[in-house]
Amino acid sequence: MSPAAWAVMALAGGAGAVCRYLVDGRVTAAVARRRSRRAAAGGRSPLGAMPVGTIVVNLTACFALGLLTGWAGRAPAWAPGVLGTGFLGGYSTFSTACVEGARLFMAGRARAGCAHTLLMVGVSWLAACAGLALGALAA
């Protein structure tokens, strides 16, 4: 791979990380507002303290990578490296999701920690399958 291709992939990774930060922040803020309204009305949020922003980021990353992979036969040669490895590699945050699940568990919220971890793996896998199927249809 040429030095220019490496540079473009690195820039795409940085752009993906910025997008992750923005998406996670907006989703987290929206969920916090919803939780606050429910609490003011005397109710509980069905999401509890789940880190929903990270779930949304990983779900969309898995779907997008599945879509890209399914479409790869028709994609330009640069697309898998720049978009898959670069942008989506910077955007997805599976390690953060695992740490968040472990933190919930270690804070005495074992059910929430297990639910978060199982939800992340299961739903992310389903999103990747859906992306692969749609990408294959587009190819």
Identify the function of each model-found stretch:
Residues M1-A139:
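Membrane-interface helix-loop junctions in multi-pass transporters/channels
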